[in-house]
Amino acid sequence: MSDFSSSVKLKYVKLGYQYLINNFLTLLLIPVIATVAIELLRMGPEEILSVLNSLHFELLHILCSSFLIIFVSTVYFMSKPRTVYLVDYSCYKPPVTCRVPFSSFMEHSRLILKDNPKSVEFQMRILERSGLGEETCLPPAIHYIPPTPTMESARNEAQMVIFTAMEDLFKNTGLKPKDIDILIVNCSLFSPTPSLSAMIINKYKLRSNIKSYNLSGMGCSASLISVDVARDLLQVHPNSNAIIISTEIITPNYYKGNERAMLLPNCLFRMGGAAILLSNRRSDRWRAKYKLCHLVRTHRGADDKSYNCVMEQEDKNGNVGINLSKDLMTIAGEALKANITTIGPLVLPASEQLLFLSSLIGRKIFNPKWKPYIPDFKQAFEHFCIHAGGRAVIDELQKNLQLSGEHVEASRMTLHRFGNTSSSSLWYELSYIEAQGRMKRNDRVWQIAFGSGFKCNSAVWKCNRTIKTPTDGAWSDCIERYPVFIPEVVKL
């Protein structure tokens, strides 16, 4: 009972400290304003008129001062970055014919890897502990025995995912293809010629002066890189919009070998994609869902271990796949630390920044063994969208950032329902929060993504308006069942 009382007292002490630091300027100004008000009340009308009459300004001085104020204001507003709005987005929902229950996945594995039962057993153990559910999907070409990862099959998957997501976005926003000013496509492992962005331009007959970009090889954090590219372009092109397509094409990247480190992606990655509409038009302010506040990118490619921890390569038999290093979680943790060191001062309240600075100075000057202070990011954000790369990734970030189960619920449920959809997973998570009716006006969202190279990228969004629970979308047919309990091990 005494421990409980102490914890309650400590909680209120911390709340009082936070209130004092975060409202320091307000508390400081209150006595000043009160003093001025009291002095004015003590003065009579004649004294006030006498003070006003003593303030003589020449007309020239007034005009010069006015001109200076107007000039400074004009320069300020012209140099101020344009606000970037997230008008709306759409997540691809695969058809039920692409569903891959555990039983089907393991049956395919036994038939494809019939000469190597140990690899089959390894995949089964991974799947049991993966956090994936029975409704994740793989493209049609992977359902064949053996799989048929041809160029045509890969293009068919790309068209199915991208065009469906774009059609939904057009329907939800009323945007016409001819009105698109900027197009950015990110797909890490499938980079055909002509590019995927050219495929979209051809399909929708987009304008000849459209600014199109196709990003490949950027990994699971590529969606936020695309947002960064779009933000920079929207700063120099006024009254414009940008469409971002984030996806990963699974068809050509199914690994057929026996290397365990390269079999992991087969168990985790599933098909998916998202189409996102950004705009810098002031007229879109009232209908936009979010506005972009901050975007921070961290790249640790100069370090050899970080560079090599996620690598596309051939095994000894010539089978191409993605090799995931055992050091992946350690490297991801280091990248996250570097990223939050940059984004922390931009978003954390003064109370948390002061505690973090005190801890840092204490470790540098007094004792390096002092436990570092982990800022409470729950004071800066109401919602967290952590890349659903796997159960271990979500567990590690929940532990490091001291988040509750509800804070990482969107990530866990997205992994369960859709699997690791690579760069688009952040948008499935945001869609989950909206589908649960939790997104309110002025709520802040932190998107965190990791990618090969090794990269950690963060984006901070602020909700423009309370989001009504959508009646359609990727979660529309299953949101009533979520959240679900996900056991540590699912016996197959």
Swiss-Prot record:
Gene: KCS5
GO molecular function: fatty acid elongase activity
Compartments in which it is found: Membrane
SUPFAM superfamilies with a match to the protein in the record: Thiolase-like
Gene3D superfamilies in alphabetical order: 3.40.47.10
Keyword Glycosyltransferase: no
Keyword Transmembrane: yes
Stated family: Belongs to the thiolase-like superfamily. Chalcone/stilbene synthases family.
Annotated ranges, domain FAE: 76-365
Recorded topology in the membrane: Multi-pass membrane protein
Cellular compartments per GO CC: endoplasmic reticulum; membrane
Protein name: 3-ketoacyl-CoA synthase 5
Induction and repression of expression: Repressed by herbicides such as flufenacet and benfuresate. Down-regulated by darkness, low temperature, salt, drought and osmotic stress.
